[in-house]
Amino acid sequence: MKEKIRKKILLAPEEPGVYIFKNKGVPIYIGKAKRLSSRLRSYLNPQTEKVFRIVEEADELETIVVMNEREAFILEANLIKKYRPKYNVRLKDTNFYPYIRISDDEIPYVEIVKRKLRDGTYFGPYTSVQFVRNLLEILQKIMGFRTCKSDLKRIKRPCFLYHLGRCTGPCIGNIESHGEAVRRLKEFLSGNMEEVFDYLKEKMETHSRMLDFENAAKYRDLLLNLSNVLESQGVVFEESISCDVLVHAHDLFVVLRVRNGYLVGKISFEMEGGNVEDFIREYYVSGRGDIPKTLILESDLDEMDYSSLGFEYVGPPRSTTEEDLLEKAKKNLENELKMRGLRKEALEELMKLLNMKDFPYRIEGIDISHLQGKYTVASLVVFEDGFPKKSDYRRYKIEQDHPDDYESIRTVVKRRYSKHPLPNLLFVDGGIGQVNAAVEALKEIGKDCPVVGLAKKEETVVFENREIKLPHDHPVLRLLVQIRDETHRFAVSYHRKRREKESLRSVLDSVPGIGPIRKKKLIEYFGSLENIRSASLEEIARVIGSAEIAKRILDVL
């Protein structure tokens, strides 16, 4: 420890605050304390390897005095978020979790995003993108908030969503009704769902009393669909409870998010060397997750009154329902730990089998899909620590005159790894020919990486021009089959979309009166020929603004 650091520690103030160890002006560790003097004196006699490294590397110590522990906690969280010091524990997402963002524009729009920034009102994170899409679709039908990002001042007439009754039309002056739609959406996503359910029930009953059974059925269906979307998360509690439940073991943290009696998400994070207080700082105080009124833990936290941060209660269960939720969270945690144990075992076996130097933490998988050489596409999927990392998935469109899987693989490998770092292991769906094509492509760009394949016939592992036959229940084979199936699924889904869009373009080109703008609208709205075939004349006419041309389209189809 440098002498000037020792002197600063001995002169540290008694007040609460934040301390920052720096090396060459860069923060390497940031901490908080009720009493800076007491906390910093513990660094004079390091008890762990981490503390020893901090004091050995630091050439500067800065302290910031604040009024109370709450201010220290928030300041610590903000500084860690800003500087990301290397010795502070970090929260690592084990999956990609979506947020719902309401923009901060004068007339806001609503969208699904991957990251939480300071540019609007955010809700989440949620467990599934599909769940969020389904939820927003039904809520938009009920409320009519806008999802377009268009400059409203330049719009002369409303889009098809307005004509379908899914948008209030702020672009044509319906500002107040749109503001009300956004308010109701915020209330709903904050957990106050009763207002929307009561509104739908009232509308259904009113139309029923008026013998307007068509509209009564419409609101009944909206009510049922909304309930079904929420229940699709798997758990509904009789009591209208809203809370988060946090459990952890080792470096893994699991949070169950319950809003108004519905389980809206289960999320898991890794935090090496972190405790519950670290998690609250990294997840809630730094703004990654909404602060709920109630946070259920396995035991009390003694150090701080978290109500000053926005929580009304932080602690162990107070009711049978909360106890049940805690048990559910524990079971989810046990399952996550079990899965991680199995995946780690499979990865270790894979490392031994292929005689790899590095642990295969990141595996990238490639597959090619085409139809007799047409509409060729490639998928690239990513597995980290044995689990899919969907936010890193990529798709590639390949132009070629004749079908050639080997050349397609070479093309994708060169495009990908000329610009991106290599994974620990590259997986290719195929046998020796496909694997060799990937190896050759890497050599052409001066790169080297282990490449493994899985031959479709008898599911044989292919590596370095040799075939390895494994028992069907071998953990390595199960892992490689999962990666193979995921690359195939992702490639086929992209190929299908490309084929359908190309077919749709081809048909639309033959319809008189369909120019580039109308063609783009039809493709964006319907996506496939099948969807247009099943649409009504009125719906197609609303999209393109012409009943006559809509009739021509249906005649061609």
Swiss-Prot record:
Natural source organism: Thermotoga petrophila (strain ATCC BAA-488 / DSM 13995 / JCM 10881 / RKU-1)
Keyword DNA-binding: no
Description of how the protein assembles with itself and partners: Interacts with UvrB in an incision complex.
UniProt keywords, alphabetically: Cytoplasm, DNA damage, DNA excision, DNA repair, Excision nuclease, SOS response
Family designation: Belongs to the UvrC family.
Locations listed in the record: Cytoplasm
Function: The UvrABC repair system catalyzes the recognition and processing of DNA lesions. UvrC both incises the 5' and 3' sides of the lesion. The N-terminal half is responsible for the 3' incision and the C-terminal half is responsible for the 5' incision.
Listed GO CC annotations: cytoplasm; excinuclease repair complex
GO BP term (any one): nucleotide-excision repair
A Pfam match: UvrC_RNaseH_dom
GO molecular function: DNA binding; excinuclease ABC activity
Protein name (record): UvrABC system protein C
Keyword set includes DNA damage: yes
SUPFAM superfamilies on file: C-terminal UvrC-binding domain of UvrB, GIY-YIG endonuclease, RuvA domain 2-like
PANTHER family: UVRABC SYSTEM PROTEIN C (PTHR30562:SF1), UVRC/OXIDOREDUCTASE (PTHR30562)
Domain GIY-YIG positions: 14-89
Domain UVR: 194-229
PROSITE patterns, A to Z: GIY_YIG, UVR, UVRC
Main localization of the protein described in the UniProt heading: cytoplasm
SMART domains to which the protein is assigned, alphabetical: GIYc (SM00465)
